[in-house]
UniProtKB/Swiss-Prot annotation:
GO CC terms in record: plasma membrane
Lineage per the UniProt record: Bacteria, Bacillati, Actinomycetota, Actinomycetes, Kitasatosporales
Native source species: Streptomyces coelicolor (strain ATCC BAA-471 / A3(2) / M145)
Membrane topology: Lipid-anchor
Signal peptide start-end: 1-32
Lipid modification (N-palmitoyl cysteine), residues: C33
Subcellular location: Cell membrane
UniProt keyword list: Cell membrane, Lipoprotein, Membrane, Palmitate, Signal
Protein name (Swiss-Prot/TrEMBL): Uncharacterized lipoprotein SCO2278
Lipidation (S-diacylglycerol cysteine): C33
């Protein structure tokens, strides 16, 4: 399940790294966090062998959770957007199939290429670009993160990208990649601002993002669905950037960045007087609180991967979205 490229990442800002003090020299920073000397040194986030093992362990845990419809079985191997999407999916599955997943097919991730950035401090992260036995010919891009040496690598992002669309990354002579800071100004949109700009674009349009399936086409589809006989659908989009949802970016060979980021979306369906909201499927019902009478509000978490050039429009290459909750009224 391996082959390599190089990696980078930021995340879980609220935690100070807790490292065993056995013969290790420690010092206190102004913030009160304990810092291990050498932590500020620029180092590869992981070895290629560690990255391959992290991918293997994630796949094993994911398959166990999917087979049993039990979110606790892969909770230690997911975080951020992927954890929000995956745990909700498993919760709905368990509600409808308490004996487990009758359609379980083990996920197989092969032809893995690892892009591992060199960076200082925590969190550290890397990208696995893989082929899967699901999702057609799309490449599965997973971003793994961790906040300390004793912590488990967790998958924070999972996006699917069409073959040939994954860019070449800038690497040093040893094959290690370069992490792009969240506040970088040498790209069209600083990675920290992509989630806000994307959600603003979905509401108002604009020229920041290139036309495509996840931009102009999605806006057109939502506009088409907003008003139908007896039913009005409203859309609200919000950025999601803090903690485990922080964006992560890799420098591309042409000077731009490949950015992974998260957003939150709400869809409210309201039925006209004397009519009712169409009955949703069982998975939606399993995640919905309250009785659906005149309206249904659904909350989704979406993780995106975008090509953020040094100059020009941002291209959203892939997006995976999942329902996380619902409310009937």
């Amino acid at each position: 399940m391996s082959q390599d490229r190089g990696p980078r990442r930021p995340r879980r800002l609220e935690k100070c790294a807790l490292i065993s003090a056995s013969a290790t020299v420690l010092s206190l920073t102004a913030s009160g966090c304990v810092v291990v000397h050498g932590e500020r040194e620029v180092l590869p986030s992981a070895t290629r062998a560690e990255a391959a093992k992290a991918l293997e362990r994630f796949t094993t845990a994911y398959n166990k959770a999917d087979k049993a419809y039990d979110a606790s079985l892969d909770a230690d191997h997911t975080t951020g957007a992927l954890a929000a999407i995956d745990s909700a999916r498993l919760k709905a599955g368990a509600a409808n199939h308490p004996d487990g997943n009758p359609a379980h097919e083990p996920l197989e991730l092969t032809d893995a290429k690892f892009t591992i950035p060199k960076k200082a401090g925590w969190p550290r992260w890397f990208v696995a670009d893989t082929k899967a036995n699901k999702g057609g010919t799309a490449r599965w891009l997973l971003v793994f993160t961790r906040d300390g040496l004793e912590e488990t690598w967790e998958a924070a992002y999972l996006t699917l990208v069409a073959p040939g669309k994954v860019p070449e990354f800038k690497t040093d002579q040893d094959g290690w990649a370069e992490a792009v800071p969240a506040n970088a100004t040498d790209v069209s949109v600083p990675p920290a601002g992509l989630s806000k700009d994307y959600t603003t674009y979905l509401q108002d349009g604009g020229k920041t993002f290139a036309d495509g399936v996840h931009t102009s086409s999605w806006r057109a589809l939502r506009e088409k669905r907003s008003t139908r006989p007896g039913l009005v659908t409203q859309y609200i989009d919000e950025p999601l950037t803090n903690g485990d949802y922080a964006p992560l970016a890799l420098r591309t060979e042409d000077g731009g960045a490949l950015v992974f980021f998260t957003s939150r979306h709400f869809e409210k369906q309201t039925a006209a007087r004397g009519t009712s909201v169409p009955t949703p499927n069982k998975d939606v019902l399993a995640l919905t609180d309250g009785e659906i009478k005149q309206s249904l509000t659904m909350e989704f978490v979406s993780n995106e991967v975008a090509l953020d050039p040094a100059d020009g429009q941002v291209s959203v290459l892939g997006r995976v979205q999942g329902l996380t909750s619902g409310k009937g009224e």
